[in-house]
Amino acid sequence: MGIPSASYSITMRVHLGADPLGIGRITTAVGEAAGTVVAVDIVESHPDLLVVDLTCNAVDARHADAITRAVGAIEGAVVHAVSDRTFLLHLGGKLEVASKVPLRTRDDLSMAYTPGVARVCRAIAANPADARKLTIKRNTVAVVTDGSAVLGLGNIGPEAALPVMEGKALLFKQFAGVDAWPVCLATQDTDEIVRAVEWLAPGYGGVNLEDIAAPRCFEVERRLRESLDIPVFHDDQHGTAIVVLAALANALRVVGKNLADTRVVLSGSGAAGVAIIKILQTEGAAQIVACDRAGVLHKRREGLDDSKRWVAEHTNPDGRTGTLRDALAGADVFVGVSGPGILEPDDLKPMAADAIVFALANPDPEVDPAGARRHAAVVATGRSDEPNQINNVLAFPGVFRGALDAGARTITEAMKVAAARAIAARVHDDELRPDYIVPSVFDRGVAPGVAEAVRHAAGERPRE
């Protein structure tokens, strides 16, 4: 069984009789059912009745049901209601539009809206660049998805993707002050996605592509980067790649190795995998071997799509063949952006001394982290309940903050590398250790540091 977490947190409204040990009995029941008690709040107290709200964390929904049954089985305890705290948090959505301008007088109204707003409209019509300083455009990002590759849920459609996009927008605002808004498109046709974003672009200062399946995501991003004069950034690719580079730079410091001299094995040749390859090569990695479900990608393999063909032609200089396990022999680094449980811990044993393992599949990594630590000096995952969490939130808020502030028209590879270096630098020499190679997602210095680095790397004077 996994570890109880807040993502499966419930609150039970429990009625207890006069038994003074009632609270102790129900909290014990939660513990015996392998749950974690978070809080006990007394709602009502009477001589013969005690009403409490019992909040606890579970491993999953089925486990939460089992905990509820265990509490209800206690003599004298009656569970009257159960609330899923995650669903409660999402009621009515997680975002709202707030006004920056007071509307208390006729003067306020005549300046914010008609007739005064017409003068501003004419100014922008005469000089469209003024939209950046006279509208929300300079600080607004569209979070665009077609719902085709949402988290580990797959192709669930635009409506079901909306809670994730809301969460993304929330992170933009919380960590970098960027006003982001979900744009969930009811199409998975590449031409229609590109056209829709082009039509919407005048109202935004940047476009964050999210959860669009490969290989479609590559063409969508490429075409939008060519046609728009605002930054376009596919976070599943580049956000992941930036944080992987940051974490790997620090992990290599821990084990005393250089990226140029290491052999990296990568599992997963989708959106994130391709971006990781590109950013590592930009930083000097020369020995990268990529694998998919069928094994090592190499130039002689047939039946590869365009993205995998690119990977085969730009990696694996020694022409290695075989399986993922074959590729791991003697490798210094394993990076997994593929699927759960594809490796056993002992599969890592043939790796080089002081190996580095990044098993980033979510929610279940490619290899058990505890088992991986028997064979690797540094282990990272994508999970918040494990040390060294590789989380895109370390990158994308600051990347867009810096790009928007610089008035950048695109996000270059140099800007991505600068972001990675800024993230890595947040872990100081006296803090660096095998279980601390990336800063906390709640480190308030990360986004400003990334923004400054990106702004400097943009090499452009801010557009007014």
Where on the chain are the PLM-derived regions?
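Adenosine-phosphate binding glycine-rich loop
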Residues: 231, 235-236, 255-258, 359-464
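Rossmann-like adenosine-cofactor binding region
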Residues: 309-378, 383-385
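Glycine/serine-rich phosphate-binding loop and adjoining beta1-alpha1 elements at the start
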Residues: 79-262
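A conserved regulatory-domain signal marking ACT and ACT-like small-molecule sensing domains
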Residues: 1-93
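Glycine-rich phosphate/diphosphate-binding loop of Rossmann-like nucleotide-binding domains
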Residues: 151, 156-176, 228, 234, ...
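Short, structured coil segments at secondary-structure junctions
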Residues: 75, 176, 227-228, 284, ...
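Flexible, glycine/charged-enriched surface loops at secondary-structure junctions
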Residues: 38-43, 80-82, 183, 210, ...
